[in-house]
Structure formats: structure tokens, C-alpha cells
């Protein structure tokens, strides 16, 4: 179920309950006065072999372990300054760090609308063969 949750962003923010009992971690960009301009949340997860992209599922068990980008939002006042791209890069860097120490294959996101899907595709995410709004980025393709 999507809801605005009081955060003035360009789109809606999905509430999936992923932070119940510490199941996710949220990372926030704010100014000195505490005004939030953007945030994202990440959680551990898995994707079925059939729903994974070919490159993600290759030589992996079923289900395939992933990091889930549960939310990413930018305040409408911070639109146009590439804050979303910076937040995404930080999330990718954190997921890569996890993948170097644990068996995590990809970063997975559920895009809420076509604009969000295009944003993630621009940064190399690929569409799930079963769920067009589920996108994945194989982490070893972004390692330095």
C-alpha cells in the first residue's frame, strides 16, 4: 500500500513494514536544522530464481540472496540537484560492501511508478523477467 507519510516528495512512499523489529536500516540526508531532504532504507532479502534476471541467477541457489532497497525518496525542494543519484550511489556502495563479506548477489528495488523505473534503469538496473517493476543490479558489475 502506498502512502505519503508526511514526507514532501515527488512520488509516494511505499509502506512495506520492513523496519519492524530492526529488519531494515535507514540512511538520511538532512541539514543542520534537522530538515530531511532525502533518505533510503535497505534490508536483507531474497528473490526467487525465476524472478531474478539471467545475470543475477547464474550459478546461484534458489532463492538468490539480495539486498533490498526498500525505499528511496527525495524532498521536492531538493529535486534537480542529483540527490537521488547520490543516495542511490551510497546504497550501491553499502550493498557492494555487504556482498564482499556475505553471499549477496544483487541490489533489488520495487519501482513504484514508471518514472522511478526509468531512474533505476538509467543507473544499470535490469527488469525482472516476471515482475516488470522489480529491478536488479548485479553487485559485482559495479565493483571498482
Identify the role of each PLM range:
Residues 1-81, 85-144:
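Non-catalytic substrate-recognition and accessory regions of acyl/acetyltransferase enzymes
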